[in-house]
Amino acid sequence: MNAGSEIVEKWIEKVAESHPQSAAALRAPQPDPFRNPIGYTIRNGLAQLWEQLQGDMDPDAIDSALDNILRIRAVQDMPGSEAASFVIPLRAILSQASGTFDLDLLDNRIDRLAQAAWGKYKQCRDQIGAARLHETARLARTHRLIRKAGA
């Protein structure tokens, strides 16, 4: 296992520790996208984020990976600060890693990634709120039509 894969595996473990409800899904060695979509999505998202942290920090690739991870975390029962904080443990993992990483550069990029994660989480929660509001309005209209038809 190379240093990058080792870091991603440790990061996955930290995410699993932070949210026990997802732990089994994340700890599956080779998650199947059909049998274990949560584990598969989060594992792939973290691997993509790690690639971007080491690479050119492509905003579209980062947004896509964060979107996949945070859509899951936005519907789980956890506070927003916890849902978006999965980026932070990467600092400790890197400080203990046996690899040649530019820690100052990665530290700055982790900060940017954490900010982007919070923004994406808020966007996902806003979408959930809008969907709930739309569904409530639809049910109210349906209820009025049923009452009107029965009257």
Regions found by a protein language model. Name each.
Residues M1-N68, G99-A151:
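Core of compact, soluble alpha-helical bundle domains
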Residues R71, F86-V87, I110:
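Generic preference for hydrophobic/aromatic residues in regular secondary structure cores
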